[in-house]
Swiss-Prot record:
Organism field: Mycobacterium sp. (strain JLS)
Organism domain of life: Bacteria
Enzyme class: transferase
EC number: 2.1.1.-
Biased composition (Basic residues): 1-16, 49-65
Protein name, UniProt field: Uncharacterized tRNA/rRNA methyltransferase Mjls_5122
């Protein structure tokens, strides 16, 4: 009978699907499918490309971490020394191997050591990479992001001081040196804080720290998501909002700064933005003799703050 494997003389071949032996364990299927796609060269253990990739990974692990967008790397011997003298809260001082130890390098290392700042000697190529090949003179100082206060914290600081609030808000100020100088003036004349917009404004960078001469470590700087809305809120809370502009309709001599006040400073070029100007209780100008049309923003802020401080002492 055809197909009867029990008949006499029949021989069963090994590996057939008939009888107790079923399947081949996938051998035939794998044989038909082949070995699949060839992996990339860098994933083949014995390929030169894989060896190069492994070597590069090991070198990357030994390198100092590249600074992120949130940190700042101050470069150059003079800027680094100035930041350290101003007590900028740095986290690491990078020194390129083979850097000549002149007076500035020696001072930077000494201040960093006395301040508990990590001192890392790295290959010059690593510092080149971290600085995007900018001129660093063998020194780099890593500065963490500034810890901004909330706008309400400025009012709380004034309340704790027991004096009428004296705040400064910046509008269209993009130069961090102006910001640092204003922070320094606010601290010098008894102010309680500085408010800056979250966008399109200078921020507290290492340059601002250095210009503030350390005042940024003592005076809170807050960021407002919407400057105009924050100023309105402060006005509703009893603060006088005083804009500072060369075209102001009130002179500084006429300003009464003895009560709670926030001085809004615009840039030398653009001045105050339209919405901010419209929401000021007064827009003040500084009387000047001679042909000078305007003052630098930080200088103008210092003049107004000095006058308010004089009034409060009287």
């Amino acid at each position: 009978m055809a197909g009867n494997s029990k008949r006499r003389g029949a021989v069963r071949k090994a590996g057939t699907k008939k009888g107790p032996t079923v399947g081949s364990g996938g051998v035939r299927r794998r044989g038909l499918e082949g070995r699949g796609a060839t992996p990339p060269a860098h994933q083949r253990p014995n390929h030169p490309a894989a060896k190069r990739a492994a070597k590069a990974a090991k070198q990357q692990q030994r390198r100092p971490a590249r600074k992120t967008d949130e940190t700042e790397l101050v470069l150059g011997r003079n800027p680094v020394v100035e930041c350290l003298r101003a007590e900028v809260p740095a986290t690491a001082l990078y020194v390129a191997m083979g850097t000549e130890a002149d007076e500035r390098v020696t001072e930077a290392v000494q201040i960093a050591a006395d301040s508990g700042i990590s001192i890392l000697e790295v290959p010059r190529s690593d510092l080149d990479r971290m600085s995007n090949n900018a001129l660093h003179q063998g020194l780099g100082l890593q500065v963490p992001p500034y810890d901004y206060a909330h706008p309400d914290d400025l009012l709380a600081t004034a309340k704790a001081d027991g004096a009428p609030a004296l705040l400064v808000a910046l509008d269209n100020i993009s130069d961090p040196r102006n910001l640092g100088a204003i922070v320094r003036s606010v601290a010098a004349f008894g102010g309680h804080g500085v408010l800056i917009p979250q966008r399109r404004s200078a921020s507290v960078t290492a340059v601002a720290w250095r210009t503030s001469a350390g005042a940024a470590a003592r005076l809170p700087v807050a960021r407002a998501t919407n400057l105009n809305r924050t100023l309105k809120s402060w006005a509703d809370g009893g603060l006088q909002v005083v804009g500072l502009d060369a075209d102001g309709d009130t002179t500084l001599d006429e300003l009464d700064g003895t009560g709670p006040v926030v001085v809004v400073v615009g840039s030398e070029g653009k001045g105050l933005s339209r919405l901010v100007r419209e929401n000021c209780d007064a827009v003040v100008s500084i009387p000047m003799a001679g042909p000078t049309e305007s003052l630098n923003a930080s200088v103008a802020a210092g003049v107004v703050l000095a006058e308010i401080a004089r009034q409060r002492r009287s």
